[in-house]
Amino acid sequence: MKSLSFLNHEFEAFPSPELALTDPNGLLAIGGDLRPERLLSAYYNGIFPWFNSDDPILWWSPDPRAVFIPGEIHISTSLRKYLKKQPWRITINHAFTDVMAGCAQPREKQSGTWITQEIQMAYRELHHTGHAHSIEVWEGERLIGGLYGLAIGQVFCGESMFHRKTNASKAAVAALQQHLLKMGFKLIDAQVMNPHLESLGAKAIKRIDFITLLSELRNNPLDPATWTTKEVILELE
């Protein structure tokens, strides 16, 4: 039976994602807080927060789930040619706070953002504890694009991306895929399907299948150097 849970500020286990509502799709719980242990518990169980600034905290686990398989993200021939011509520099974990701020800027035709100051503070704390990570794209000293997300074992949970120059966010995606492949990641959680994700090769899978994959991969160990600050050289051949 589908049901909506209400969380208080006491830390408690999340309900099973299978209890999430079908309308709105995936809404599982309301309330609680964004302390690191609660956020990590959420992602560990296939749940993520998403809410507007005037809403309570809303927790989601939609069905179906949008995912990428590292190595199967579509980087078109024209995009490869374009990126080869750019003098851009790409880094990992050089400017997490600035990437989040870039992602928080309202999109065209949008008046607000779900990446509130509360969200930014919570994920900065996860970054400081080694759980949240960023990819940055630079033109000279100017940050022109990037993305951020969480690593849960061999699963990367993508949260948001932004660009200030055409295709800069796609460069970040290409760099992320290349890095995850080298480091043995098996899955990228993209949460909710949309036309842009679909154009990049995202697949919609049943929630139960996503949770099964997550449970198989979330405890797998990684190279300790996986998320050290570094530069990425795109391999676009």
Swiss-Prot record:
Domain of life: Bacteria
E.C. code: 2.3.2.6
Coiled coil, from the record: none
GO cellular component, one term: cytoplasm
Function: Functions in the N-end rule pathway of protein degradation where it conjugates Leu, Phe and, less efficiently, Met from aminoacyl-tRNAs to the N-termini of proteins containing an N-terminal arginine or lysine.
Name of the gene encoding the protein in the UniProt record: aat
InterPro entries documented for this protein: Acyl_CoA_acyltransferase, Leu/Phe-tRNA_Trfase, Leu/Phe-tRNA_Trfase_C, Leu/Phe-tRNA_Trfase_N
Family named by the database record: Belongs to the L/F-transferase family.
Keywords for the protein's UniProt record, in alphabetical order: Acyltransferase, Cytoplasm, Transferase
Source organism: Shewanella baltica (strain OS195)
NCBIfam families from the UniProt entry: aat
Location(s) in or outside the cell: Cytoplasm
Protein known as: Leucyl/phenylalanyl-tRNA--protein transferase
HAMAP family (UniProt xref): Leu_Phe_trans
Signal peptide per UniProt: none
One Pfam assignment: Leu_Phe_trans
Gene Ontology process terms (BP): protein catabolic process
GO molecular function annotation: leucyl-tRNA--protein transferase activity
Recorded catalytic activity of this chain's protein: N-terminal L-lysyl-[protein] + L-leucyl-tRNA(Leu) = N-terminal L-leucyl-L-lysyl-[protein] + tRNA(Leu) + H(+); N-terminal L-arginyl-[protein] + L-leucyl-tRNA(Leu) = N-terminal L-leucyl-L-arginyl-[protein] + tRNA(Leu) + H(+); L-phenylalanyl-tRNA(Phe) + an N-terminal L-alpha-aminoacyl-[protein] = an N-terminal L-phenylalanyl-L-alpha-aminoacyl-[protein] + tRNA(Phe)
